[in-house]
């Protein structure tokens, strides 16, 4: 799984990662080989690395693997047993749940250096959602038994996960209210602002740095694709946004905030 070679002043980790997951077209396994130093691991997962002792860092590094996913590839499926803590190093990921009639609801989106896929393990249950890559992604995977051992030994690390779960719960509560109590215009405006806050904008300071399909934007906003297309068109007519294919430029953010607030 992981081969470790010791040097005088540093440790190099040769990571061989093979992760098998189900997709509509069968199973996909991606083999990744990558050399990582302790400094590179520390840069990849700073929040996790910082509170650890030297011996704990060595133990974590020996169980640290890198995984790459293609665009639209499934990362984990609903009903699967959680095995790893995941941290997104590059790319964009959606957490979603399939609903009635084949429609999906995007529950949340993951940004760089964000940890996910661990709540179900703590709850001793299988995944109640699924995850997939919006675009090519690189992630680190750490076996959950390793995380549990470190938490039992390190109170600061335990507090880190308590804070993370608390923040995630707060975001989930806010999203639930927004998606169930707001009308279509308010939901779509909230989603556009949510994407800006999560992924930021490009150099022009207006264009969202994530290019979602109309279907994904609809699934994020709890509406049909046709409603998302129609509402986006209305926003463009009202000069709130500019649409260029999948690129969306926010022109009047203050009015979008008002629409989102009014609901």
Residue positions per predicted region:
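Cyclic-nucleotide recognition modules
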Residues: 56-57, 108-166, 170
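Short loop/turn motifs at secondary-structure junctions and domain boundaries
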Residues: 58-59, 75-79, 202
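Polybasic "coupling" helices that flank or enter modular domains
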Residues: 152-222
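Cyclic nucleotide-binding regulatory domains
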Residues: 48, 73-136
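Alpha-helix/helix-capping structural signal
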Residues: 90, 145-146, 167, 215, ...
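Cyclic nucleotide-binding regulatory module and flanking cytosolic helices
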Residues: 22, 26-71, 115-116, 120-122
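N-terminal amphipathic/basic-hydrophobic helices that include classical n-h-c signal peptides
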Residues: 1-30
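Phosphate-/nucleic-acid-contacting segments
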Residues: 15-18, 23, 197-263
